[in-house]
Swiss-Prot record:
Domain of life assignment: Bacteria
Species classification: Bacteria, Bacillati, Bacillota, Bacilli, Lactobacillales
Location within or outside the cell: Cytoplasm
Amino acids binding NAD(+): D50, G51, N126, E127, R152, D154, T165, A166, Y167, N168, K169, S170, A189
UniProt name for this protein: NAD kinase
Species of provenance: Streptococcus gordonii (strain Challis / ATCC 35105 / BCRC 15272 / CH1 / DL1 / V288)
Gene: nadK
Any one GO molecular-function label of the UniProt entry: NAD binding
Function: Involved in the regulation of the intracellular balance of NAD and NADP, and is a key enzyme in the biosynthesis of NADP. Catalyzes specifically the phosphorylation on 2'-hydroxyl of the adenosine moiety of NAD to yield NADP.
């Protein structure tokens, strides 16, 4: 595909540095004869941080089979970004050499079944979390049609492999490599005593298994899907499963390996004497 055939959409957050980088990037893309359009793009470039990339993911979540993403970070290293703000020229050069290769990560499908029979479907790149709005949540958890436990606590989070480094990690969950197509269940402040017991640790669930959560109260619950929050009453159950689609990133020599992202985000440089 020639530069003049590639349709590219560019988005940034509202921070001055991101807007400045975005304007420079758009200028250089035009100089190199790329087509700039938000409608049915081949490549979507996010300028900002992981939060911005989550936003553009949801903007194009119905076109995942046709779109590849690129992240440009204007702060600290992000998990979904391959370029820093001072690497715009490198990004342009790699886009000119782009062959259509991609790096793909699994995403989460969330189905919310309401008592009136309606079903709401959401997609998550990082995680989805269900909580009762103002009281302790009580819910039955079923894994692959096995009644697993009755949960009592603040909520339950289900994350993707790439999302395992986000909210899931702060809940004490494990970090999963994205080539492991599995979901992870993490408890949010569970109640554990002589009367009420849960497993008390995160659970890795394989791709083929379905996670079902049945709230025992029909009052108001909140369901957070990445950086979006929804409120529902009268939830019959919520299903979590790996979606049939994946998110695709532009593969390039600059694509940072997952373990390098983890190291840079949480550990930093390792002492050579170790």
């Amino acid at each position: 595909m020639k530069n003049t055939d590639k349709k590219i959409a560019v988005f940034s957050n509202y921070k001055p540095q991101s807007k400045e980088v975005c304007q420079l990037l758009i200028k250089k893309l035009r100089q190199n004869r790329f087509i700039l359009t938000d409608k049915n793009p081949d490549i979507v470039i996010s300028v900002g941080g992981d939060g911005m990339l989550l936003s553009v993911f949801h903007k194009y979540e119905k076109q995942l089979d046709k779109v590849r993403f690129v992240g440009v970070h204007t702060g600290h290293l992000g998990f979904y970004t391959d370029y820093r703000d001072f690497e715009i020229d490198k990004l342009i050069d790699n886009l000119k050499l782009d062959t259509g290769a991609q790096v793909s990560y699994p995403i989460l499908n969330v189905r919310i079944f309401l008592e009136d029979g309606s079903v709401k479907t959401k997609l998550a790149l990082n995680e989805a979390t269900i909580k009762r709005s103002d009281r302790t949540m009580v819910a039955d958890v079923m894994i692959n049609h096995v009644a697993f436990e009755r949960f009592r606590g603040d909520g339950i989070s289900v994350s993707t492999p790439t999302g395992s480094t986000a909210y899931n990690k702060s809940l004490g969950g494990a970090v999963l490599h994205p080539t492991i197509e599995a979901l992870q269940i993490a408890e949010v402040a569970s109640l554990n005593n002589r009367v009420y017991r849960t497993l008390g640790s995160s659970i890795i669930v394989p791709k083929k298994d379905k996670i079902e959560i049945f709230p025992t109260r029909n009052d108001q619950h909140t369901i957070s899907v990445d950086n979006r929050t929804y409120t529902f009453k009268h939830i019959a159950k919520v299903e979590f499963q790996i979606d049939n689609h994946k998110i695709h990133f532009v593969a390039s020599p600059s694509h940072t390996s997952f373990w390098n992202r983890v190291k840079d985000a949480f550990i930093g440089e390792v002492d050579d004497e170790i």
